[in-house]
Design a protein with these regions (language model features):
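N-terminal, polar/charged subdomain of small-to-medium soluble alpha/beta proteins
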Residues: 1-94
Length: 94
């Protein structure tokens, strides 16, 4: 299924499911960025909260890379910006 058929958020969620997250919250923040340079249409801005045991022993940078490796082909279009908060289950402030 293509990104257009599944939707950008759905595609992101599908790709990130390979990290076996216990929490995966994806927010579309695009409306807050409408009209700014690089995303004149305002689309493609997302915030991600992801909790996975697979992040254990990884630095913050390595966690971000693990996320970005799965969605790199979607950046810069259709994903213009992705704010990432990545935790292990032990770190997650529940």
């Amino acid at each position: 299924m293509s990104v257009a058929q599944r939707g950008v958020a759905g595609t992101l969620e599908d790709r990130l499911s390979t990290l076996a997250p216990t929490v995966l919250e994806l927010a579309d923040d695009s409306a807050e960025h409408a009209g700014h340079a690089g995303a004149a249409g305002g689309g493609g801005h997302f915030s991600l909260l992801i909790v996975s045991e697979q992040f254990s022993g990884l630095t913050r940078l390595a966690r971000h890379r693990a996320v970005l490796d799965r969605v790199a082909d979607l950046i810069p279009h259709p994903v213009h910006a992705l704010a990432i908060r990545a935790y292990t289950p032990d770190e997650f402030p529940s």
